[in-house]
Curated annotation (Swiss-Prot):
GO molecular function: adenylate kinase activity; ATP binding; zinc ion binding
Any one Gene Ontology BP term: AMP salvage
Keyword Amino-acid biosynthesis attributed: no
Sequence positions that bind ATP: 10-15, 127, 199
Protein name in UniProt: Adenylate kinase
Lineage: Bacteria, Bacillati, Actinomycetota, Actinomycetes, Acidothermales
CC annotations in GO: cytoplasm
Length: 217
């Protein structure tokens, strides 16, 4: 099965991507992993991407698409894959369709993790990170014994800039602006499946797996 997983920040996409891919026995492919491997292996694409990242710029679509194309040529994806973090735009989606068509394949389904904005804000703005060991706690879901102090090492806990409520709200706005056309694109093709991402991790995974049974027939 070939699928794409999309969802807003705080939807648990990384966790679900790993669990769903494991259930399907297909590789989880994330753009972050692809970037890191290309940079670590000092490939021509990795060197090019690093130039942009070091300058604080976004890696151009052409470089990202080329990296994904290389990855999808691997032997381990012949029976399927789960893409996490790609495509992000309609342009990238069209390029992905073209890549797969060249190989005589197609995308089977796009899973969209659907979660309430207020829940995303609760999940992310409640996170506290240890300044010493970098362990992440949560003021509601996984609080330390002593407020502001890490149970593991006694380090001071702080709130990352990315986890501040106003930053989270802005990230959500950007996500919806960028992703709405992509969601419409896949909905028009009839391969979009919404998954309720509220509740415990294992319940969300169970919903996704149940939905995928329909698409694997």
């Amino acid at each position: 099965m070939r699928l794409v997983l999309v969802g807003p920040p705080g939807a648990g996409k990384g966790t679900q991507a790993q669990l769903i891919a494991s259930h399907l026995h297909v590789p989880k492919i994330s753009t972050g992993d692809i970037f890191r491997k290309n940079v670590a292996d000092d490939t021509p694409l990795g060197r090019l991407a690093k130039q942009y990242m070091d300058a604080g710029d976004l890696v151009p679509d052409e470089v990202t698409i080329a990296m994904v194309r290389d990855r999808l040529a691997g032997d381990d994806v012949r029976d399927g894959f789960l893409l996490d973090g790609f495509p992000r735009t309609v342009h990238q989606a069209v390029e992905l369709d073209a890549m797969l068509a060249e190989a005589g394949a197609r995308l089977d389904v796009v899973l969209e993790l659907v979660v309430d904005d207020d829940e995303v804000i609760r999940r992310l703005s409640g996170r506290r990170t240890c300044a010493d060991c970098a362990h992440v706690w949560h003021v509601t879901y996984d609080p330390p014994t002593v407020d502001g102090v890490c149970d593991l090492c006694g380090g001071k806990l702080f709130q990352r800039e990315d986890d501040r409520e106003e930053t989270v709200r802005h990230r959500l706005e950007v996500y919806y602006q960028q992703t709405a056309p992509l969601i419409d694109y896949y909905a028009a093709r009839g391969i979009l499946e919404g998954i309720d991402a509220m509740g415990p991790v294992e319940e969300v995974t169970a919903r996704a797996v149940a939905a995928l049974r329909h698409w694997s027939r």
